[in-house]
Amino acid sequence: MLRAGAFDDYEVVEPMSAFKWKRLIQIGEVQHVLPYLSRGFSKHEDDRQLTYTESLRQEVERISDQQIPSVDAYLLTITQEEPQLTNFLSKRKLKKLRKRELNSEDCSEETLQMLNIIIHNVNQTLSKGISLQGIIEMGRFLRTKGDKVDFVKLEQWLHQLGITRLASLQGSILIEVFHFDMNEIPFMQKEEKAASKLTQRSLTHMAADTAENWHFRMRTNGMVENNSRVLRRNLRRSMRYMRYNPVETISSFMANFAKSLSEIEE
């Protein structure tokens, strides 16, 4: 459904129970991809394999007014505050890199935009899990503006910032989940074999991850308590991405931990 809605990639939909269809829409809400699901349903409305129960019809009707943002509108959303890396040294490198590029005579706006999308996805992945919205928007950007990106320069930036493998993971998801060709993603060094598994895990667990906030509370006796289950879940998620960039992964975890401490509720 998402492939059809986001990239016009039509294929026959396998029959699913009403429960699974409802679950798909719930995941779409959590992942912020309802506009693409809605368009996917529209493209498959004559598919005989898609059996509409009354409850499914009501759900499809409920999301039918979702509008797909333009690529430029999405870029504006994620760059209202420039995406940053968490690690201090990487953040400083990124600041210098951006300043140098903006002052360059051959400044490439599209290459900076591509970098912003990648960094935004890195932040989402390390703090919440893989974002299908971010991956889809990366794919849309590549197919609409990729010809204007200086991929040689982009690869150099990714290497300098130490996020080459995290970027390759994003590209691998485009290949595994959305059937992109590798030649559409020039910045990829290699396909990450765990891409599909990590995506499935994020889809399964993100609803639970976002249902409970990870924060500390002040008890009446002055002691501070934390939801240990959510803490362990965040720690396990961080461990899954250690191989891709241990420094940024640890920095992201500690930043989220510190933020939780700063928001202690009484």
PLM region spans:
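Conserved NTP-donor binding/palm subdomain of two-metal-ion nucleotidyltransferases/polymerases, i.e.
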Residues: 1-266
